[in-house]
Amino acid sequence: MHQVMALAMVCLLVAPSILRAQNPLIEDEIEAKVEALLQKMTLEEKVGQLNQHSGSWDVTGPVPAGNEYAQRRAELLKKGGVGSMLNIVGAEATYEAQKLAVENSRLGIPLIFGYDVVHGFKTIFPIPLGESASWDLKAIESSARVAAIEATASGLTWTFAPMVDVGRDPRWGRVMEGAGEDPYLGTQIALARMKGFQGDDLTDENTMMATAKHFAGYAFSESGRDYNTVDVGTTTLYNIILPPFEATAKAGIASVMNSFNDLNGIPANGDSFLQRELLKEAWGFGGFIISDWGSIRQMINHGYSKDLKQAAYHAITSGNDMDMESQAYQNHLKELVESGEVDIRIVDEAVRRVLRMKFHLGLFDDPYKYSDTDREKALLYTDEHRAIARDVAKRSIVLLKNDRSVLPIGDDVKNIAVIGHLANDKDTPLGNWRGRGESGSAVSLLEGIQNAVGSKVKVSYAEGYTMSTDDGVFNRALHFPEDDGSGFAEAIKIAKKADVVILTVGEKALQTGEGRSKVDISLTGRQLDLFNEIRKVNDNVVVVLMAGRPIVEPELYEQSTTLLNTFHLGTEAGNAIADVLFGKYNPSGKLTMSIPRAIGQIPVYYNHKSAGRPSPGPGDEGSVFWSHFNDEENTPQYPFGYGISYTTFEYSAPELSGSTMGMNETVEVSVDVTNTGDFDGEEVVQFYIRDRFASTMRPVQELKG
């Protein structure tokens, strides 16, 4: 199909802000209500608003006798000693907890209910790293909107997402939660996800508070080891790490979560520069800051605070408003104020921020507005939501190789061999941080292929290899067999007879995520061995790589002829991949995180600066005295922005609306894109700039549109 599209891009120096859609009269009214309520509150009640507790107890009935933990939480709720709960989910459960707080406490201040709604609630979407590969901001916003609709129908009012950490190190397991290595694209995606969660009006029962996390530098943990120290210079801090936080703060995000790590020697939740000077004062952030789970207490482990009392002091005075599960404020903040160590005005300001968001949510008008069981039954896991999940999933798939034009699979193919543990895995596609997605509820790749071909094509399956010896749990390590080849014979047998082989390799869901850092990010077990055996007996092998991070496996990339990178795609994974395999959808995804050739290259990213000796000059070939590895190329296996299609596109020369651009000005770039191939397709048009001579060094490339 030959079609010309005229595209215009605006090159921006800063990310566009989402309009807050806030009426000044309403804002003034809310501020007046906050002040009036604050004047009525005792010190104990003020401190209570700054505590968040986990609801690891059943509140749908009487608090069980003998459960001391539950009894303490119930008593705190009745006294107004809790401002927010997390991990209480469901319209009925949140109603009961809200009732304890509102109908028993002196002032009846309602609770906010928080939860990690990261990439879907009941209907699960692609992991954020995968979703970012769509480069489709409308699709990403729709993903967050569906998640908000489902989560709020289950009583939740607050999500601890989006994670906006810019990540360069795939050894760090939490890259699966982010949008990759680029601050510009990461900022646009952060704003889209924030808009999807919060909408334009937080009083709308289909919207919820969003959280920009982790502030700041968490993804730069040394060696990719989770919770490790972070030491970065101001150039990296201001140009790479902070832009998504600044943009979301200025756009009106409801909350910011600080990070577990220290930043240049100061724990982030005790850093006044980050939280007070930068976020609240310079950027005008109007929401509140919450710590991560138990992280105020962890300032003791950092060697920054001598005990929990001092940790509470460091946190509140540096601008950390709410304490998540450290009990530092609960146990020590009242004492710190009464002793004069902490000014009551600091506490009042933190409480104002929390109350302000409760008024914005409309909780004082109706504290039970999110606890509607009929709405919950009607809005979870609907056909419409699954259709949206399938659409977003197919847009997130990246075609890395199609050398033999095996894809899309044509009608002449009558025998397909589907091989690999992951092909018949209904849990792994959900990824880590899967909200309330039910284990084993995803459409597997095998099911997706069977749904696509019906009885017209013979589909055979062999596991080939065993991925793990357990199903895994969120907070426990997985165990992998090293030498299980017992399934090879059956896999080879069906591969020999097939017209096309679909071979899955990659990672289980819980191999990435929090606490899942790895020094070896190659394929586990004998997956690569099976790939080599299968390609000996069939030339038409389509490799489907399912993983939560870039996988370092050069032999796989170099020896395969057809390769799809599908990440963990969520509820509709199998159907979405089948849409691409059989040409119902032409893949348009592009990588947002470079795939290294070797682990020793890490970090490898596209927007690096030029070295003083970047490459050998004329006559210097063979010289070692330039910035390179003696045993590997500098470039990644696949770079940021890479992804091919079933068709081809031709670009005209770009035209600029002007030859210069001043501070805070824009230049429009126009280009004609022609589809010169045989398939309909969509193209992600990327625009990069380079400032060749500047007062401070700039990257060799910077994405700007």
Report each predicted region and the residues it spans.
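Bacterial Sec-dependent N-terminal signal peptides
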Residues: M1-N23
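Glycoside hydrolase catalytic-domain context in secreted enzymes
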Residues: A21-G705
